[in-house]
């Protein structure tokens, strides 16, 4: 690495960005069971198991309310076809509550398969690192003390922007993982609503929302791939321009590309919800 302070500051900001991008790539290919050593998942599974008791109680409640609202009289309940329909609904709802964790992990694994297919098709095993062009390093190193003063200001502003954007992006990806945990922990309660016909929309909405959170990972991977292709063709640097102009032009275009990626990551939940009509 160069001994120049301006170059070091810019390179440190880019290193932060590259490390966060690599961390995102690693998180998106991980299962909730293995995330952070699996300690969080064990607690979530325990909470899920404890809430199953409440889920079974609500299952009976939703079932009774559903029978009362859908049947005009007790005579209808005694009809074989109607009784069979009610029994099948209750059995399915109980199965969904009992095996809710397995159902949700199956959904997650399907989406992970989609994400892996996108990565393999695009030919990306990891993200491309963003590096400082040699022309800028040489121009900055050739600057005198007074010429480098405006460069310090430009570098500080640019480095701060890049660092802030990298943390905003990683927070969005971590937020998705936390939502996966929240959905998994509380799943028995909304899934119990399948026992009653009037309340079944609660369960449907819950599963749709969970699927949307899972699909966010695929959207984020697509955004990272597009940004990596941008990074392969870095901003054009005019070698005849002044050092300050070169740095300012490079940082401006780079931050614009980064803003596009951060915006895509932040809006991934909205994009998915529009896709599946939530």
Which residues make up each language-model segment?
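Alpha-helical transmembrane segments and their helix-start/interface "positive-inside/aromatic belt" motifs
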Residues: 1-10, 80-100, 203-213
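Non-cytosolic segments of integral membrane proteins
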Residues: 94-186, 220, 224-277
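Hydrophobic alpha-helical transmembrane segments
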Residues: 53-65, 157-163, 180
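Short amphipathic alpha-helical coupling elements at transmembrane boundaries
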Residues: 23-26, 82-89, 109, 116, ...
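Hydrophobic transmembrane alpha-helix segments characteristic of membrane transport
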Residues: 58-94, 186-200
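Alpha-helical membrane-interface segments at transmembrane helix boundaries
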Residues: 44-52, 84-88, 92, 141, ...
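Alpha-helical transmembrane segments
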Residues: 191-208, 240, 271-277
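Binding/recognition "hotspot" determinant
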Residues: 1-58
């Amino acid at each position: 690495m160069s001994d120049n302070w301006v170059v070091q500051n810019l390179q440190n900001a880019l290193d932060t960005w590259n490390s966060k991008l690599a961390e995102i790539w690693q998180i998106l290919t991980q299962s909730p069971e293995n995330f952070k050593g699996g300690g969080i998942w064990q607690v979530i599974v325990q909470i899920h198991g404890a809430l199953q008791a409440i889920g079974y109680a609500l299952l009976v409640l939703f079932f009774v309310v559903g029978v009362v609202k859908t049947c005009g009289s007790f005579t209808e309940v005694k009809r074989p076809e109607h009784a069979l329909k009610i029994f099948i609904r209750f059995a399915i709802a109980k199965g969904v509550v009992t095996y809710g964790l397995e159902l949700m992990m199956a959904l997650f694994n399907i989406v992970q398969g989609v994400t892996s297919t996108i990565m393999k098709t695009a030919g990306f095993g990891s993200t491309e690192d963003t590096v400082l062009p040699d022309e800028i390093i040489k121009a900055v190193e050739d600057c005198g003390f007074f010429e480098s003063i405006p460069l310090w200001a430009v570098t500080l502003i640019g480095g701060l922007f890049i660092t802030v954007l990298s943390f905003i992006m990683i927070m969005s990806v971590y937020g998705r993982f936390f939502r996966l945990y929240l959905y998994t922990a509380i799943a028995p309660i909304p899934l119990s609503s399948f026992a009653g016909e009037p309340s079944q929309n609660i369960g449907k909405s819950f599963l749709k929302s969970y699927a949307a959170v899972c699909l966010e990972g695929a959207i984020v991977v697509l955004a990272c791939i597009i940004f990596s292709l941008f990074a392969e063709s870095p901003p054009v640097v005019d070698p005849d321009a002044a050092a300050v102009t070169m740095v300012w032009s490079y940082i401006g275009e780079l931050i614009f590309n980064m803003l596009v990626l951060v915006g895509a990551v932040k809006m991934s939940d909205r994009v998915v919800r529009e896709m599946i009509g939530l």
